[in-house]
């Protein structure tokens, strides 16, 4: 009897160990579900935000982006070249590729080109930051007025480029470490409808890339996982740059990451790092539930990718008007959001600052 009891206890113990082992040894594509981000110290926060420069972003990126850039236009090509050359010049060593294709539109076959920048293509998992670089097409009948799409989405694209530039050293160190978690940037072409929004006349670039990734094995030798499985979290930035931005919650599956942004906002406010920011929370509202918004995340959402949609609610007052220009941008909120986003990315990637600023005593 005693021997049986001992055997039963041994088997139970082995079962517990096996269960714990199996819980830790989850498939790589499920690691995103239990991913935990780091929290930077106050000195590390100060170091991270000291690298970003709003004036630099404004001159180098935003002014370059503020041109008519509908698909196939000269402005579109100019902006694409700027994105590629900017990322290609950085020390982190981004792999920059194009996803070029033709698609039928209300104006016939038109060329589209997405840009994909990957910090470490060998990494199994990717945090994705995404935006669209095209501007809405208006026929030439508006007395010479041009739609520049400052919030929609020149500012979001500029913010992503500034993040890569400001955190170049940190991202290079992350890449050199061989981490299995990396950063990927998507710049979509053809988000806007060319005539009237339908499922066919919209989201040209994101629909094409989502399908391409769904049919491309990842890792390359895989038989049952695709590049879509590599996406830990898909963070889409849109309609950013107006005054008093608020970001609500569309997806319960990523509430904790919207809450993470709110916590970063609170901490930076408490440390005095946010300008003209009277309340500790102004931007990120995980308790504010908003309805589904059609945007470049939809083709990825439909494939099961987890989405964090950073789009202002309500939309900016200048949305889809000729007043969506540089003159009506709010520099202060853009600068504050730059800081919050850059901290969020480094914390998600579990990347400590290279040279933390010493805390005062």
Residue ranges and their predicted role:
Residues 5-25:
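Cleavable N-terminal signal peptides of Sec/SRP-targeted secreted and luminal proteins
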Residues 25-29, 34, 40-41, 50-122:
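A non-catalytic alpha/beta surface segment that caps or lines the substrate-entry region
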Residues 36, 71, 233, 239-361:
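Active-site-adjacent substrate-binding region
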Residues 44-52, 64-77, 101-106, 142-154, ...:
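Second-shell loop/turn segments in exported
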Residues 57-64, 74, 78-91, 155, ...:
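Extracytoplasmic/secreted proteins, especially bacterial periplasmic and envelope-associated proteins
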Residues 102-105, 121-123, 133-137, 190-194, ...:
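Solvent-exposed loop/turn segments at secondary-structure junctions
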Residues 116-118, 126-130, 184-187, 232-238, ...:
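Structural recognition of the beta-strand scaffold that forms the well-ordered cores
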Residues 145-260:
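Acidic/histidine-rich catalytic neighborhood of metal-dependent amide-processing enzymes
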């Amino acid at each position: 009897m005693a021997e049986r009891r001992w055997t039963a206890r041994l088997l139970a113990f082995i079962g517990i160990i096996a269960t714990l082992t199996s819980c830790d040894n989850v498939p790589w594509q499920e690691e995103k579900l239990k991913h935990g981000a780091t929290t930077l110290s106050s000195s590390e926060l100060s170091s991270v935000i000291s690298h970003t420069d709003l004036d630099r972003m404004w001159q180098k990126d935003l002014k370059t982006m503020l041109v008519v850039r509908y698909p196939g236009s000269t402005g579109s090509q100019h902006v694409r070249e700027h994105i590629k050359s900017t990322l290609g010049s950085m020390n982190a060593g981004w792999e920059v590729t194009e996803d070029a294709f033709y698609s039928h539109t209300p104006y016939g076959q038109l060329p589209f080109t997405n840009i994909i920048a990957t910090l470490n293509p060998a990494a199994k998992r990717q945090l994705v930051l995404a935006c669209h670089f095209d501007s809405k097409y208006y026929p030439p009948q508006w007395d010479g007025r041009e739609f520049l799409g400052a919030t929609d989405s020149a500012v979001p694209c500029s913010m992503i480029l500034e993040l890569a530039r400001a955190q170049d050293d940190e991202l290079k160190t992350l890449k050199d470490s061989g981490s299995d978690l990396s950063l990927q940037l998507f710049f979509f072409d053809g988000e806007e409808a060319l005539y009237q929004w339908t499922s066919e006349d919209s989201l040209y670039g994101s629909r094409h890339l989502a399908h391409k990734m769904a049919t491309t094995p990842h890792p390359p030798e895989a038989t049952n996982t695709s590049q879509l499985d590599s996406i830990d979290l898909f963070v889409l930035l849109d309609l950013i740059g107006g005054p008093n931005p608020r970001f609500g919650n569309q997806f319960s599956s990523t509430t904790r990451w919207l809450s993470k942004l709110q916590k970063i906002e609170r901490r930076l406010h408490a440390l005095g790092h946010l300008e003209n920011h009277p309340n500790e929370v102004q931007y990120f509202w995980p308790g504010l539930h908003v309805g589904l918004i059609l945007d470049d995340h939809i083709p990825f959402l439909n494939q099961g990718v987890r989405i964090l949609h950073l789009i202002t609610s309500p939309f900016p007052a200048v949305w889809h008007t000729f007043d969506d220009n540089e003159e009506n941008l709010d520099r202060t909120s853009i600068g504050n959001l730059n800081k919050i986003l850059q901290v969020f990315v480094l914390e998600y990637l579990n990347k400590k600052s290279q040279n933390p600023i010493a805390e005062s005593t």
